[in-house]
Amino acid sequence: MATGGGAEEESQRGRPQLPLPARPVARVEEPEGVREKMGWAQVVKNLAEKKGDFREPRRRDETGSGASGGLGSPGGLATPNPGDFPPAARGDPKGRRRDPTGEASDAYRKKSASGAGDPSRRKKAEVTAAMATPARPGTTEDATERPLQDEPPAAGPGKGRFLVRICFQGDESACPTRDFVVGALILRSIGMDPDDIYAVIQIPGSREFDVSFRSAEKLALFLRVYEEKRELEDCWENFVVLGRSRSSLKTLFILFRNETVDVEDIVTWLKRHCDVLAVPVKVTDRFGIWTGEYKCEIELRQGEGGVRHLPGAFFLGAERGYSWYKGQPKTCFKCGSRTHMSGTCTQDRCFRCGEEGHLSPYCRKVIVCNLCGKRGHAFAQCPKAVHNSVTAQLTSVAGH
């Protein structure tokens, strides 16, 4: 049956139709059966008036495909893209796929409206929406790398800070990375364990690396090995260790003419004057032969006048020992003065009681042990001496 609009329809098909601008019009109920009699151009015109210009700008590849002309499309009109139309609602007979983001947000809005007064339902809806919403590109983050909100902070190494600063003194452009300092210098060359280190901090662009240790013993170990390795291994070239945490940390050397002095007695004497951070070790020469020296890491104590230094010479029993470390002042063995040495000293000092003013043969005072520092006994009878402790153990074993 002729519709009366055939000529107009044919003329409209011959040239592309542009959507008309949207303008507000009153919605008029169309009588049933009128849509079947309208032509293609009239249908497009009515849709443009009711919906507005709902088409999105086509992408470059879509424009090219439309220009070439697809099969089944009217001449001069581009093939409609399903993405140009709004997503279908639930129950849509055409069965278009919906955006999961839109579904999640719709569910969240509906549940929020229905359960606004129920906090548990609202929280559950938020979790459901978050799980259904896909992550944006570039924002995917490994869960293991994201810090936990409730994780307690790491425990510090103690009240004090045990720091060294490793400085690179070469060309700035050749400054190694933090991984090199940690892996090559601290872990491999020094032989430290990762658990011994509290933190290694480098300010971006800086050539300084602050290393914090968990204890004074680990710091002393680092310093001792560093002194041995810095001249032997090329990895320490252009590196220097500065800014030690405490000026009272020292590497002490002790020497006796008698090599039979027990190292435990040396430690007992040292603990009277300083804090021993590591057990003394023997010093050997280039042939591997012991020189008679002991070396250990100590921390000097603070006194009323500042740092309390160790004497340069002392006695353990009848054996005379010598001590030295960097920064140790030279003092007179008799009176402790820094203005002269014992060879020119005119002061008398008793080595029996440790007081000045008289010599040992004329001493009438109570003897003082030069090992433990207590009165009433000499080194030979000192209960802290190794020879007495061993004798006591053997005596107790023989008695049973």
Swiss-Prot record:
A GO BP entry is: positive regulation of RIG-I signaling pathway
Compartments annotated for it: namely:
Cytoplasm
Composition bias type Gly residues, residue spans: 66-75
One GO MF annotation is:
zinc ion binding
Disordered: annotated span: 1-157
Q: Which GO terms describe its cellular component?
A: cytoplasm
Q: Which UniProt keywords apply?
A: Antiviral defense, Cytoplasm, DNA-binding, Immunity, Innate immunity, Metal-binding, Phosphoprotein, Repeat, RNA-binding, Zinc, Zinc-finger
Quaternary form?
Interacts with CGAS. Interacts with RIGI. Interacts with IFIH1/MDA5.
Name it.
Zinc finger CCHC domain-containing protein 3
Record organism: Mus musculus (Mouse)
Higher taxonomy? Eukaryota, Metazoa, Chordata, Craniata, Vertebrata
